[in-house]
Amino acid sequence: MTNISLDKLVTESRNENTKDIDRVETLEMLKMINDEDKKVAEAVEKELIHIAKAVDKIGESFLNGGRLIYVGAGTSGRLGVLDASECPPTYGVSYDLVRGIIAGGESAMFKAREGAEDSKKLCIKDLKNINFGKNDILVGIAASGRTPYVIGGLEYANGIGATTISVTCNPESEMSKIANISIAPVVGPEAITGSTRMKAGTAQKMVLNMLSTGAMVKTGKVYGNLMVDLKATNEKLVERAKRIVMQATGSKREQVEKILKETNFDVKLSIFMIESSLDKIKAKEILDKNKGYIVEAIKEIS
């Protein structure tokens, strides 16, 4: 257990702006919370340089067969699992490429297991269970920057030569000193003292969104701002797939539906077939040669 005193942590400080939150009308209470929330995006903005470095590292790892692994406890762990679980349907990647690990295991997603965060060895065990390797990226998430579970994971990852990234909301935290890249949006004291599921959690969610989205953009999963590798696994996504191809190519619905049927709803391949006027086999060959980057594939045939 780390010996950092809680009274030195920004996230545990008392917020003078909300000290009367229990004595005001509902609307005023919500305005207080909203005013605090407005500070989050600005805090994240100050960390963009560090976030960019992290995105570049993650994208490079993906291209070299590595994975993105989030570890955290409590709210931080849940946010990692949430971000990871959205990557396969959005970008068509395997469930193994981006993974979230929460202290205490799957049951901790639904019921707090606070004691699990106090063990460094538990995180090391969890990482070994997924065969975490030096080509993978470890992102340790903890508002305080002092959670033993996460620190144990970062130390282990450093020890095997993997790239480590910390996402915290306290400046100069222990985690930030251990990680290769430190991302620390300082959002200030919470509206409810110590309730880091609020501003800190929001900041962490924004950062994780940037990390995964940025890496997917860097690895050709996006064309323009369209998610061209999505998996059309339900009616909503089937319709979205059609709209994406229409938006990307300017084609009529009838043509798009025909091409999507031919490609078994491979959105990226459908777009490139229309843009290139190539048949499916040739289009796939060129697309694969260019590692799925539509822009690069189009350049090759121009």
Swiss-Prot record:
<dbReference type="GO" id="GO:0097173">
    <property type="term" value="P:N-acetylmuramic acid catabolic process"/>
</dbReference>
<dbReference type="InterPro" id="IPR001347">
    <property type="entry name" value="SIS_dom"/>
</dbReference>
<comment type="subunit">
    <text>Homodimer.</text>
</comment>
<dbReference type="InterPro" id="IPR046348">
    <property type="entry name" value="SIS_dom_sf"/>
</dbReference>
<keyword id="KW-0119">Carbohydrate metabolism</keyword>
<dbReference type="GO" id="GO:0097367">
    <property type="term" value="F:carbohydrate derivative binding"/>
</dbReference>
<feature type="active site">
    <location>
        <position position="117"/>
    </location>
</feature>
<dbReference type="InterPro" id="IPR005488">
    <property type="entry name" value="Etherase_MurQ"/>
</dbReference>
<keyword id="KW-0456">Lyase</keyword>
<feature type="domain" description="SIS">
    <location>
        <begin position="58"/>
        <end position="221"/>
    </location>
</feature>
<dbReference type="GO" id="GO:0009254">
    <property type="term" value="P:peptidoglycan turnover"/>
</dbReference>
<comment type="function">
    <text>Specifically catalyzes the cleavage of the D-lactyl ether substituent of MurNAc 6-phosphate, producing GlcNAc 6-phosphate and D-lactate.</text>
</comment>
<dbReference type="InterPro" id="IPR040190">
    <property type="entry name" value="MURQ/GCKR"/>
</dbReference>
<dbReference type="GO" id="GO:0016835">
    <property type="term" value="F:carbon-oxygen lyase activity"/>
</dbReference>
<dbReference type="InterPro" id="IPR005486">
    <property type="entry name" value="Glucokinase_regulatory_CS"/>
</dbReference>
<feature type="active site" description="Proton donor">
    <location>
        <position position="86"/>
    </location>
</feature>
<protein>
    <recommendedName>
        <fullName>N-acetylmuramic acid 6-phosphate etherase</fullName>
        <ecNumber>4.2.1.126</ecNumber>
    </recommendedName>
</protein>
<comment type="pathway">
    <text>Amino-sugar metabolism; N-acetylmuramate degradation.</text>
</comment>
<dbReference type="GO" id="GO:0046348">
    <property type="term" value="P:amino sugar catabolic process"/>
</dbReference>
<dbReference type="Pfam" id="PF22645">
    <property type="entry name" value="GKRP_SIS_N"/>
</dbReference>
<comment type="similarity">
    <text>Belongs to the GCKR-like family. MurNAc-6-P etherase subfamily.</text>
</comment>
<dbReference type="GO" id="GO:0016803">
    <property type="term" value="F:ether hydrolase activity"/>
</dbReference>
